[in-house]
Amino acid sequence: MNMSLPADRDTAKKPSAQKPSAHAQNATAAVDVTALGLTESEYTQICSLLKRSPTKSELAIYSVLWSEHCSYKSSRRHLRQLADLTEVTKKHLLVGIGQNAGVVDIGGGWAAAFKIESHNHPSFIEPFQGAATGIGGIVRDIIAMGAKPVALMDSLRFGAASDPDTQRVADGVVSGISFYGNCLGVPNIGGETAFDPVYQGNPLVNVLCVGVMRRENIRLANASGPGNLVVLFGAPTGRDGIGGASVLASDSFTSDAKANRPAVQIGDPFVEKLLTECCLELYAADLVVAIQDLGAAGISCAASELAHNGRVGIRLDLSAVPLRDTTLAPDEILVSESQERMMAIVHPDNLEAFFEITNRWGISGAVIGEVDNSQYLTVVHEGKTLVRLNPKTLTGPSYNRPVKKPAYLIRRSAANRLPVTNDPHLLREDILQVISCPNLSDKSVITNQYDRYVQGNTALCHPDDAGVIRMYKNTGVALSCDGNSRYSYLDPHAGAQLAVAEAYRNVSVVGATPLAVTNCLNFGNPENPEVMWQFRETCRGLSDACKRLEIPITGGNVSFYNQTDGKDIFPTPVVGILGIVDNLTQTLTSGWNAPDLFIYLLGVTRPEFGGSVWADTMYGHIGGVPPKLDLARESRLSNLLVAGAKKRVFESAHDLSEGGLIQAIVESCLRHGFGADIALDTIRATSLTEALFSESASRVLVSCRSQEDLRDLCRRNSYEYTLIGTTRHTGELTISEIGKFTLNELSDARQKVTRVLFRG
């Protein structure tokens, strides 16, 4: 479902010109609407809109399209601020919020479509299929924009690494992502994986996809042309996924939720691969007037969105729908979420050519309706009219839910009161313990399951800070997705801004100019005023950060009801940023690539441990406030990094975020196997603990050959720099105040947890 933001509508509607049959009308007499996910108040509102009782099929449609997942009824009023654009942020934006994905101009007549979405609840119940179909769904969103999918990323959150069920969920999710993505032939170039007890029983599976196309080939989900035909093509419709949007994605559930397995969709990546190539050929032949993928709510959602966006009517005949299960009732056909299906609007003169292409690719299809001037969605089955309603009524209500600042924020204790030390023996133990914690551990056992180089255009991928895909000539598209739920738990407004800043920085450190943002907002129960306060503050933080950085939000996804057994997850905004690389020969990797390089820390280190990995790992402490962020400095840092890459001032660049300086140093050593000699006394810090583990924002670790060039670049951008060491040939990291670590020792420490968890 698109993150469209329709206006809060007047619920007074004219009665339909043609009512459904009496038989169909009476079908809702004994229906328990609450079992369908509707409230009694919402059912009354539906009756008021229709001026009558809904039919069984109409009620099935409303129950899904008025779900939280589809309607954004709790989030819509807060999301409006994300759509605010200035003349500067409009510069590269071609398609914004409201379509299947955002589209930005990347130069040379090319455009990139990108979006991130969630598949959280299904991935707990059936981890493999839940995650796999999450990949399939986001890929079809990109295809529906007219683009060829060229890269994937994922942001994953699992429960405690020590919990027995985490291995089942994590292993299944990663296997599902790798299976579907690898079979589809789309490279997975990066992302993030985190573990925390707050996600026990409610993992987060957020998937980002980017596709490319010529600017003139952008497709929209706007039906037009009365008399044009509605064609359903792809896999036949089955029973899987019925009620997925309302049963799984729009309600809380208990940790024992196996009964919901039928609501999890089943995917076939080989059909999706054929469907992808088929669509691209249909676009090249200009045979599609409009197109919509089938995801949440299936046929009912796709048809209503096409009609609503195009301000036309659509008449469907369910008798013409190709079925995998012939026992499906009409209302089940309407809301089935069977995968690998698309709905296209086709001119009658082009129908023969359309089916010639689908048949060549082995894709089945059928004409199931046509566009008309009625402004209504009409559905018939075996001659009986089952549905007659205005698609505008399907956008759902807009709630102004109460908000309340959480009580835990009043009781939080400051992290800067935790014990710090300058003792070298204690610090050595701290370093090994922190870098081996689940959230900082080596994730290559995950990413090695993904085909990162299929299609042959991957220039950078994990473990670098951003992935880069080769584009026209020698340019590239850079992608990063980031989030820190501990920061958002402590301060949702600041946490959202820090997520934007980190993704922005990660794109910049590879030498790319950030262009646009997509986001996935994962929250608990919206009926909880404290959760709604978190959500409101997060939206405000996203809006403020993007305006300050002059970068547009192109769309995204909201996932509420991430709550199991009454316990809400931490607020978890995940931000994806797309950037453009002017020259791929100037991209930067995250690790030292030679000995005898000078190592510099850019930025200022402060005693900032609120929400840090160090505080959580060493003391089980999550309190205080997140690191302070100055977005003007973040913008200057980005300009400095991009300029330094173009002028070849840097040999490498690595963002500092979770784990602070020591994590960046260790990863930079292990990236290409070069050690380093580090001295911490040049860093202005109150303790060695602060120098090593502080998570102060807007900092980057760089290496260079010419110190004068680096210092001159920093001075011209008014940015702080500190020489902290040099790289070395031997496989050792020496910190003068602490001692030596072998790279094997560091590598083993970082692999302990994930090797066990993912059967590595």
Curated annotation (Swiss-Prot):
Spans through the membrane: none
Catalytic activity: N(2)-formyl-N(1)-(5-phospho-beta-D-ribosyl)glycinamide + L-glutamine + ATP + H2O = 2-formamido-N(1)-(5-O-phospho-beta-D-ribosyl)acetamidine + L-glutamate + ADP + phosphate + H(+)
Pathway linked to the protein: Purine metabolism; IMP biosynthesis via de novo pathway; 5-amino-1-(5-phospho-D-ribosyl)imidazole from N(2)-formyl-N(1)-(5-phospho-D-ribosyl)glycinamide: step 1/2
GO cellular component terms, A-Z: cytoplasm
Main location: cytoplasm
Highest rank taxon of the organism: Bacteria
One GO term of the biological process aspect: 'de novo' IMP biosynthetic process
Pfam families assigned to the protein according to its UniProt record, in alphabetical order: AIRS, AIRS_C, FGAR-AT_linker
The enzyme's E.C. designation: 6.3.5.3
Molecular function GO labels: ATP binding; magnesium ion binding; phosphoribosylformylglycinamidine synthase activity
Disulfide bridge partners, by residue number: none
Compartments where found: Cytoplasm
SUPFAM superfamilies xrefs: PurM C-terminal domain-like (SSF56042), PurM N-terminal domain-like (SSF55326)
CDD domains registered for this protein in UniProt: PurL_repeat1 (cd02203), PurL_repeat2 (cd02204)
Region span, Disordered: 1-25
Record: residues binding Mg(2+) 2: 141, 293
Residues binding Mg(2+) 1, per UniProt: 117, 557
InterPro entries reported for this sequence: PRibForGlyAmidine_synth_PurL, PurL_linker, PurM-like_C_dom, PurM-like_C_sf, PurM-like_N, PurM-like_N_sf
Keyword ATP-binding in record: yes
Keywords, sorted A to Z: ATP-binding, Cytoplasm, Ligase, Magnesium, Metal-binding, Nucleotide-binding, Purine biosynthesis
Function: Part of the phosphoribosylformylglycinamidine synthase complex involved in the purines biosynthetic pathway. Catalyzes the ATP-dependent conversion of formylglycinamide ribonucleotide (FGAR) and glutamine to yield formylglycinamidine ribonucleotide (FGAM) and glutamate. The FGAM synthase complex is composed of three subunits. PurQ produces an ammonia molecule by converting glutamine to glutamate. PurL transfers the ammonia molecule to FGAR to form FGAM in an ATP-dependent manner.
Stored HAMAP family: PurL_2
Homology family: Belongs to the FGAMS family.
Subunit structure comment from the entry: Monomer. Part of the FGAM synthase complex composed of 1 PurL, 1 PurQ and 2 PurS subunits.
NCBIfam families hit by this protein: FGAM_synth_II, PRK01213.1
Entry protein name: Phosphoribosylformylglycinamidine synthase subunit PurL
Encoding gene, per UniProt annotation: purL
